[in-house]
């Protein structure tokens, strides 16, 4: 260790040769900061903790789109009306969360630092499948708490610069990444959202059409799942929608999402069950 390093007062572990994983570095130097170590054990009754609900992902020719409703529930109560469930992971990937809100947000922050840490040490970016596996390792570390009901099951999506396509990855509670072919939904309203996606999805969707499909899917989920929020026109709370393309991550402007959502709500006044898929 140099005199400069000693002057900084950092432990020797910070200068030990290791892998490019920030999670492993944190495990060695400050394990108490990992999300898995910040939740009490299961020896006491678990209180109602806010849970995020429904998220969807759709592939389209230019890339991939993620969307989520804005509600978090705590037992039978609405804990938050404007929760952000879609987040940037890095320049060409994004993650949407369903499950225990506090742990999910910690995992997303950890993933963001993990990807940045790897890039700084290796002077190269991880491949998209590599990023998906890194998130899987973070989820796997939470398995003990998932078995107590504190599960986090995100959807990871991004643009594969090598293959030139958007990709969607879903996970089980053990952290195993599985690629979804065209679309995916997670959370309590996912069965209803997935049903809408099956009927409305087409491989040749434009970005505007993909956004409309996501809003329709979340609307259907909100109709049948009490934990999923529909559009709140009075409070101007609309779904969060983001895209990842060759140009990078982009969150759709709130005004654009508002106009799209209002058009969907207006159309539902004429056809409450939503658009009908053509038989072809």
Swiss-Prot record:
It catalyses: Cleavage of peptide bonds with very broad specificity. It is found in: Cytoplasm. CDD domains: proteasome_protease_HslV. The formation of the proteasomal ATPase ARC-20S proteasome complex, likely via the docking of the C-termini of ARC into the intersubunit pockets in the alpha-rings, may trigger opening of the gate for substrate entry. Interconversion between the open-gate and close-gate conformations leads to a dynamic regulation of the 20S proteasome proteolysis activity. The keyword Ligase does not apply. One of its GO terms (cellular component) is cytoplasm. GO terms for molecular function: threonine-type endopeptidase activity. Signal peptide: none annotated. Component of the proteasome core, a large protease complex with broad specificity involved in protein degradation. Belongs to the peptidase T1B family. This is Proteasome subunit beta 2.
